Curated annotation (Swiss-Prot):
Belongs to the DNA mismatch repair MutS family. Coiled coil: none annotated. PANTHER family: DNA MISMATCH REPAIR PROTEIN MSH1, MITOCHONDRIAL, DNA MISMATCH REPAIR PROTEIN MUTS FAMILY MEMBER. This is DNA mismatch repair protein MutS. ATP binds at residues 607-614. Keywords: ATP-binding, DNA damage, DNA repair, DNA-binding, Nucleotide-binding. GO terms for biological process: mismatch repair. GO terms for cellular component: cytosol. It comes from the Bacteria. One of its GO terms (molecular function) is ATP-dependent DNA damage sensor activity. This protein is involved in the repair of mismatches in DNA. It is possible that it carries out the mismatch recognition step. This protein has a weak ATPase activity.
Length: 864
């Protein structure tokens, strides 16, 4: 395209667009942001705005679309949610200041990971940007949140990368534009940067300059050992600088994170436990949504962070527990204060990047005064004492803001009325001139009459000649020497004095001068506030922590959560545990025990579909997770030993993008667990092997269960419909059979959701199908076919060879028939036991008792 064939304004646009080819350019023209050419076409489609034309280029109409300046945020929010980045190009020159178009430049770039405007952010979600820098052995990660000032780095490996990204929930990911860039399994927006931007040397230079240090050892980073992490952190910091058009001043140091700090959870586990998102992608009901009673958005975000980062450090957990206990008696007064607290964390971020608004400062002022009033009595909690000691430190900032900012300032700085009265004498004078000009004129008139003795003297104003002193013709010749003639009339003369001229200049320009001075003073206030950012961030974190801890305290009281105990030996003992989410969704929830220790490491869980197996397993994992956040747990009592990680393999779906079937996804997740599980890991396995043929699935499930028992020795909850596996406790003392009970009443079934010892008697699949609404004809056909299969299995059961053996540790092929037949025997024993268990002789009439006796006799014949 030829620039010479278009207007100067369009030439300017094309020059700016050439520097931002991968972004939409919002080009400020008066009260609109305009988009041109391909940007206009794309924006019109994404935002459903009108596409029009303006002028021509090379004989082709130039396509154009626009959004109003005052409503730009809502359009930016929509674009960012779609993963788009937008360059904001503002008018920075004076209109009509010279020839050609007004000067414009890109003042910032809005990307999914670098948002600070409250209108573009979810109140309860942390917005992070992550940089990924790979080498042959390791992958360096660095992530930051411009809203909180978080800035961290970590070394990881390729097989753990996607799990780390799932944990961090990145809004934007920076990758080197090279062949060595790792493959990601994430929906987050990916931004490609030149590979040289991830160079460790350049990264270390930028980071040391930013933090004002000689090297990064003080942050735990060695230039050789952590080279890829340093490269990632440098690329990230530089990207933030370029997009914000300034170097951020609020990044809270650079910390090195390690696996030993938190209980590990892979991406599948976070998804299956529905911590902050349901399996269907919704925000509720989740663990977070059910627990979140926080009074502040800062508290809600910290709660989500704690849930995704359960602690390993027992001392830190106990400190939180002590705080929760101490807050039980102080919850109400604390909530009264917290409910009045604004989002200090995000206000501080906007101050840091220079886009804070007047009402941000007013909210900050009021919040700091409110925090200073929090007076927790002697708590006995060292954590609470530390937190409450932070708030008085910000009182000087609050006092400064009280002096500087109006009690209720305007929304926009351009409207004035932002800087408080008495803060600056010149501004007060300009306002006095604007608001009290008539008083000045009357005072001047009285003063001049007294000075000159001229009785006809009047001080007046008109739009043509401005301010003047008018004297009658007879007294005009007596005017003082400092009176300068301005206009001669038939019966009067008009004069101007230096004092009146100065006043005129002030009045005529007072509004513009006042607005300009207010902007200057406001910028000065922001500059001073930036020096207090560490204190503001500290106060925000303390307020958020108090909010979460008080929420934990309320949960303990309102929902009967108890303080879990921690042991140094392997154990998961839970008395009457409850699922924290499900119990809030149903009228009555059946509580259940859990007992795992060094003697019983694998619970083989059987029972009907809809019986509650998956709920029970998730319940155990969530109780363990909550205990390690410092929260009390939904149970009558709980004792938990050392836990490093939680793994789940519950449900699956096709991964069409990677050409992987449901069964392949299941096996991949299972393989990861078997390779990584240790004695201090909790494993949940739900119906492993169901996606293939019966014998294949059974053989795999058997081998996986044995691997968990013999090799991994993890605490495992293993739910299955393969009743043939229920023999395992006979071969392995560390395995125990448990089942979810159900009760048949005629042709109906009642799920008791109660964990009981031993294997289940049957799966009740047809009964569940009936509940699902299958046609009666199909149900009858299924029952008939089931009866035939059961009879055939009983009739064709072969005599066991006395030399049949179980698979050995030396790698022998498993004798599937052996454990199938043995399990069938156990299965029929379970049926008889269940029949007897459900029999109540005292409630039977003689005829009913005789009928039950014949039924039991027939049942015995069928299994003999």
């Amino acid at each position: 395209m030829s620039k010479s064939a278009v207007s100067p304004m369009m030439q300017q646009y094309l020059g700016i667009k050439a520097q931002h080819t991968d972004k939409l350019v919002f080009y400020r023209m008066g009260d609109f942001y305009e988009l041109f050419l391909d940007d206009a076409v794309e924006a019109a489609k994404l935002l459903d705005i009108t596409l029009t034309t303006r002028g021509q280029m090379d004989g082709v109409p130039i396509k154009m679309a626009g959004v109003p300046f005052h409503a730009a945020e809502q359009y930016l929010a929509r674009l960012v949610k779609l993963g788009k980045s937008v360059a904001i190009c503002e008018q920075v020159g004076e209109v009509g200041a010279g020839k050609g178009p007004v000067e414009r430049k890109v003042v910032r770039i809005v990307t999914p990971g670098t948002l600070t405007d409250s209108a573009l952010l979810e109140d309860k979600e942390t917005n992070r940007i992550v940089a990924v820098s790979p080498d042959k052995k390791y992958i360096g990660l660095a992530w930051a949140s411009l809203q909180s000032g978080e800035f961290k780095t970590k070394l990881t490996t390729a097989d753990k990368l996607n799990d780390e990204l799932a944990r961090l929930q990145a809004a934007e990911i920076l990758l080197p534009d090279s062949k060595n860039a790792p493959q990601l399994q994430t929906a987050s927006g990916v931004t490609r940067l030149n590979a040289w931007q991830f160079a460790a040397d350049a990264g270390e230079k930028l980071l040391t300059e930013y933090f004002g240090c000689q090297d990064l050892r003080g942050f735990g980073l060695d230039s050789k050992e952590h080279a890829v992490s340093i490269g990632a952190a440098g690329a990230l910091l530089n990207y933030i600088r370029l997009t914000q058009n300034l170097m951020p001043q609020h990044l809270d140091g650079l910390s090195l994170e390690t696996d030993s700090q938190y209980i590990g959870m892979d991406a599948a586990t976070r998804r299956n436990l529905e911590i902050t998102q349901t399996l269907s992608g919704k925000k509720t009901p989740t663990l977070f949504s059910i627990l979140d009673g926080c009074a502040t958005h800062m508290g809600s975000r910290l709660l989500a962070l704690w849930l995704h980062h359960p602690l390993r450090n027992r001392a830190h957990i106990r400190a939180r527990q002590e705080a929760v206990t101490a807050l039980e008696s102080q919850y109400e007064p604390l909530q009264c204060h917290l409910k009045s607290i604004a989002d200090i964390e995000r206000i501080a971020a906007r101050i840091a990047v220079g886009n804070a608004r007047p009402r941000d400062l007013a909210s900050l002022r009021d919040s700091l005064f409110e925090l200073a009033q929090i007076d927790l009595s002697a708590t006995g909690s060292s954590l609470l004492e530390t937190l409450k000691a932070v708030f008085p430190e910000t009182l000087p900032v609050a006092e400064t803001l009280k002096a500087a900012v109006m009690p209720e300032p305007s929304v926009w700085l351009k409207d004035g009325n932002v800087i408080n009265h008495g803060f600056h004498p010149e501004l007060d004078e300009l306002r006095r001139i604007q608001n009290h000009g008539d008083e000045f004129l009357l005072d001047l008139e009285a003063k001049e009459r007294e000075r000159t003795g001229l009785s006809t003297l009047k001080v007046e104003f008109n739009r043509v000649h401005g301010f003047y002193i008018e004297l009658s013709k007879t007294q005009a010749e007596q005017a003082p020497a400092d009176y300068q003639r301005r206009q001669t009339l038939k019966n009067a003369e008009r004069f101007i004095t230096p004092e009146l001229k100065a006043f005129e200049d002030k009045v005529l320009t007072a509004q513009d001068q006042a607005l300009a001075l207010e902007k200057q003073l406001f910028d000065g206030v922001l500059k001073n506030l930036r020096t207090a950012l560490p204190q503001l961030q500290k106060a925000a974190k303390a307020a958020a922590a108090l909010d979460v801890l008080s929420t934990f305290s309320a949960l303990a009281k309102e929902r009967n959560f108890v303080r879990p105990e921690f042991a140094d030996y392997p154990v998961v003992h839970i008395e009457n545990g409850r699922h924290p989410v499900v119990e809030q969704q149903v009228r009555h929830f059946t509580a259940n025990h859990t007992d795992l220790d060094h003697k019983h490491r694998l619970m083989l869980l059987t029972g009907p579909n809809m019986g509650g197996k998956s709920t029970y397993m998730r319940q155990v994992a969530l109780i363990v997770l909550l205990a390690h956040t410092g929260c009390f747990v939904p149970a009558d009592a709980a004792t938990i030993g050392p836990v490093d990680q939680i793994f789940t393999r519950i449900g699956a779906s096709d991964d069409l993008a990677s050409n992987r079937s449901t069964f392949m996804v299941e096996m991949s997740e299972t393989a990861y667990i078997l390779h990584h599980a240790t004695e201090q890991i909790i494993v949940l396995m739900d119906e492993v092997g169901r996606g293939t043929s019966t014998f294949d699935g059974l053989a795999l499930a058997h081998a996986i269960a044995e691997h968990l028992l013999q090799k991994n020795k993890s605490f495992s909850l293993f739910a299955t419909h393969y009743f043939e596996l229920t023999y395992l406790p006979e071969a392995h003392a560390a395995a125990v059979n448990m089942h979810l009970s159900a009760l048949e009443q005629g042709r109906d079934i009642v799920f008791l959701h109660q964990i009981q010892p031993g294997p289940a008697g049957k799966s009740y699949g047809i009964a569940v199908a009936k509940l699902a609404g299958l046609p009666v004809r199909a149900l009858k056909a299924a029952q008939k076919h089931l009866n035939g299969l059961e009879n055939q299995a009983a009739a064709n059961r072969p005599q066991l060879d006395i030399f049949s053996t179980m698979p050995s540790e030396k790698g022998d092929e498993p004798n599937v028939d052996c454990f199938v037949d043995k399990a069938e025997e156990k299965h029929f024993e379970g049926i008889l036991a269940a029949a007897l268990e459900n029999l109540d002789p005292d409630s039977l009439t003689p005829r009913e008792a005789l009928s039950e006796l014949y039924r039991l006799k027939d049942l015995c014949k069928s299994v003999s």
